[in-house]
């Protein structure tokens, strides 16, 4: 078992922080895959580092956890993302990343044939938490992107609502976006707050109970 696998096992069933658990190494760019070959990677970029612009035949969805990162390309294309912001990069044109202060972000590979919600436009900065509204006494759900290897969903829970115990068909990460909730996992309750993450193992029984208004993104790997 390599160190990466060991870290994934440590975070299973626990509240953790992608940003705090992957601090940048001075002068370096570091990448760490999640869930094997599902196209989900945690990146840590030290200040004044960059990933050279290259052409990719697929989109990249970035979810920034810490710091800020500039996504840049040809013809003056440039978008700066801060913690809590996301972008879907364009395809078939050079795209690179650079940072002056350092950044930690999650990158999700999104194939062209993936089913994407029409609200998402390539090259535009957005916040996942802004995609869905709260509804009184309701749980509001939006599929953001879906392909054979992963699915990203954003959910808004009114205070007191939740999801009863169920199991995920693959490994999954929760991104807490707003508010607070209690995650029940294999009989243990844990509080999760905005800015934190939670790691479900495949088949792990879990539930969600919003103790306050709560928004989260669920990134699910599929077998």
What are these regions (language model features)?
Residues 75-92, 186-203:
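Short acidic-glycine-tyrosine-enriched beta hairpin
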Residues 58-74, 169-186:
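Glycine- and acidic-residue-biased ligand/ion/polar-headgroup-sensing regions
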Residues 91-115, 202-223:
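Ligand-binding loop in jelly-roll beta-barrel domains
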Residues 119-180, 186-187:
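Conserved small-residue-rich
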Residues 65-66, 82, 101, 177-178, ...:
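A cytosolic small-molecule/anion-sensing beta-strand core signal
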Residues 23-29, 36-56, 137-141, 151-168, ...:
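Conserved short histidine dyad/triad with adjacent acidic residue
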């Amino acid at each position: 078992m390599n160190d990466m696998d060991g870290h994934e096992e440590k975070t299973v069933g626990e509240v953790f922080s992608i940003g705090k658990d992957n601090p940048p190494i001075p002068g370096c760019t570091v990448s760490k895959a999640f869930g094997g070959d599902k196209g989900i990677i945690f990146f840590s970029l030290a200040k004044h580092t960059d990933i050279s612009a290259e052409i990719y035949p697929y989109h990249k969805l970035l979810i920034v956890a810490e710091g800020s990162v500039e996504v840049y390309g040809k013809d003056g294309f440039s978008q700066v993302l801060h913690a809590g912001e996301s972008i879907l990069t364009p395809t078939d044109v050079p795209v690179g990343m650079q940072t002056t202060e350092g950044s930690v972000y999650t990158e999700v590979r999104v194939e062209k044939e993936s089913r994407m919600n029409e609200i998402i436009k390539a090259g535009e900065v957005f916040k996942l938490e802004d995609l869905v509204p709260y509804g009184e006494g309701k749980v509001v759900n939006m599929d953001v992107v879906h392909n054979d290897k992963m699915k990203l969903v954003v959910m808004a829970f009114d205070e007191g609502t939740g999801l009863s115990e169920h199991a995920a068909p693959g490994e999954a990460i929760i991104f807490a976006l707003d508010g607070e909730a209690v995650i029940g996992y294999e009989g243990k309750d844990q509080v999760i707050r905005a800015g934190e993450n939670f790691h479900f193992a495949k088949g792990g029984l879990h539930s969600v109970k919003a103790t306050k208004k709560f928004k989260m993104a669920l990134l699910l790997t599929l077998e």
